[in-house]
Amino acid sequence: MPLEKPLDLNASETALALPYQALAECVRALLQDDSVRVPARIVQPLQGGGSLFVMPACDAQVAMTKLITFVAGNPAQGLPAIQGDVVVFDPADGQRQVILHGPTVTARRTAAVSLLAAQTLAPNPQGRAPGTARWSATAEAAPWHRRAALASGAGCLPGPAASAARSPH
């Protein structure tokens, strides 16, 4: 069977494929899933002071690697400090299923974990995280955390990557 080109999502499409509430519920489920394997990330120094990060993970449904670079001086050049992708594979046949925008995955995952923590530690029947105005976050992460705190969604995806692979975007 010929290999199909994987779905390649840009930043906006990646964000649409990973709604905060659903992502938070998936994180909750993955934390309880014994099939999840996340080895230590590899950080490779680059010429000029940057770093290459390789972060593999897998569970019973997907295998994936987040591959990003961090170059602190990039913003002065008009480039993002963090660039990269998350590549999701089918563990049964090794085919790439989807390529997600790495910085968007990182920002949304981090905010979803904060949302999950707030909902777990201070549950609110209305489904919104209480005291979100008092959350502490870096200037770069703060907008993502606010969006997550205000987000509403339903249900848990079978996995964030699987959801993205099935998304029409």
Protein language model annotation of sequence segments:
Residues 1-106, 115:
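N-terminal ligand-binding/catalytic initiation module
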Residues 111-114, 118-167:
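Glycine-rich adenosine-cofactor-binding loop
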